[in-house]
Amino acid sequence: TTNIYGGMHSCSLLEPFVKLYKLTAEKNYLDFSEYIISTGFSKDQDIISLCKTKEKRPFEFNHTKAYEMMSCFEGLLEYYKVKGDEEDLKAVVNFVDMVLESDYTIIGCSGCTHELFDNSSVKQTNYSEGVMQETCVTVTLMKLCARLLMITGDSKYADVIERSGYNALFGAVNSENQTMKRALGIVWKGKEAVPV
């Protein structure tokens, strides 16, 4: 999948390497973190720079994998805590602002096409039988907003956590012991889970 999404998946492990540096002070971890950041999170587009300038919204990037992209920005935020470069914080804040403007649905999730940013704020009312608004995207957005809330103190991030938690996250909980046979495309009472 690294080739499919421009290397974004591989870049999403930035956060653990920054944390390893914080725990050990081993410069190799910091150097590797800085290498990941130097890629701009994608082999064919500098997503970090695009977020600093708000030139394009996340659904307009060459690669739009929501969970991995947000994980990359979680790592950049952790790096900001180490180095204190306000430009890094600006990139993360702008990224989340753009997600909330273009890819945040009424229930508090993103990605009406699987787990991809796809202008969900507009597309959320389109009929679809496909997989959409995956829980991994909800949880990662909530985590990123929790970190921004701690750093900035801006209550808008608490609002996102609340909306996403009470709607998208709790709505995804299977409290009825329902089973799913994904390989067969059947879930619960014979309804298709994935169009076949």
Please place each PLM-identified region on the residue numbering:
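Glycan-recognition and catalytic cores of secretory/periplasmic carbohydrate-active enzymes
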Residues: 1-196
